[in-house]
């Protein structure tokens, strides 16, 4: 946002070669110390992560979506994720990703909106914004909309369409409501499986931690 305020025109220029669409390194992804906070979930080396996860633990959500943006030439991405999945991810966590993904797809299909799933974004590394919730019993997912720091207010894509900030907001809003709807429709099962997750792992947590000592969930 600060970069666009400094470089954007009063009338948005959709040409991707213009200054307002060419944010310099390191962009807006990192914190002040150039640390990628979307790789810090399990390690919690940064203050921002520590405070965010303190709040997370106060709520312990059953379903958690990590909203992102990607290249402005990409269609929308939502769950389910691509393999590999870590073997500690439960069958229910896999199943409900598909339930939510199918509901998102229904809404996108009705509006003839482009999207993809099962092709990118794994669930193996434990410190992402979607995998940290998964290793804490939730249904964790990443949603990615085209745009990012290069999107500005409006930009022409490689398909010669014009992608606007308004469109980006609307698509995230749409998947948000679709996710809430799918969760509501399966609320009893969501609650039961969340409880089952912790009942199971409180019994054999030490065994699992010893077997998978390459990372720890704090």
PLM region spans:
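Active-site-adjacent substrate-binding region
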Residues: 51-72, 95-121, 126, 133
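Short, composition-biased local secondary-structure segments
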Residues: 19-28, 72-76, 101, 191-207
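Active-site/substrate-binding loop(s) of hydrolase catalytic cores
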Residues: 1-97
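Generic structural signal for well-ordered, non-membrane alpha-helical segments
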Residues: 45, 93, 97, 101, ...
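Alpha-helical packing segments of well-folded alpha/beta enzyme cores
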Residues: 48, 52, 100, 172-179
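Hard-cation-handling environments
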Residues: 110-218
């Amino acid at each position: 946002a600060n970069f666009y305020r400094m470089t954007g025109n009063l009338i948005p220029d959709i040409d991707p070669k213009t200054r307002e669409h060419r944010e310099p390194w390191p962009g807006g992804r990192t914190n002040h110390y150039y640390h990628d906070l979307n790789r810090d979930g399990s390690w919690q080396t940064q203050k921002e992560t520590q405070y965010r996860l303190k709040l997370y633990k106060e709520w312990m959500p059953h379903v958690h979506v990590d909203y992102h943006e990607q290249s402005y030439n990409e269609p929308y991405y939502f769950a389910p994720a691509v393999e590999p999945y870590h073997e500690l991810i439960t069958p229910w966590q896999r199943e409900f990703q598909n339930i939510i993904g199918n509901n998102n797809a229904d809404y996108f299909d009705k509006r003839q909106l482009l999207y993809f799933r099962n092709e990118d974004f794994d669930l193996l590394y434990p410190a992402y914004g979607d995998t940290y919730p998964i290793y804490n019993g939730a249904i964790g997912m990443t949603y990615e909309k085209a745009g990012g720091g290069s999107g500005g207010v409006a930009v022409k894509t490689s398909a010669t369409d014009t992608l606007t900030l308004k469109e980006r907001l609307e698509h995230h809003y749409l998947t948000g409501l679709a996710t809430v709807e799918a969760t509501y429709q399966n609320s009893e099962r969501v609650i039961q499986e969340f409880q089952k997750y912790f009942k199971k792992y409180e019994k054999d947590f030490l065994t699992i931690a010893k077997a998978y000592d390459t990372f720890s969930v704090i």
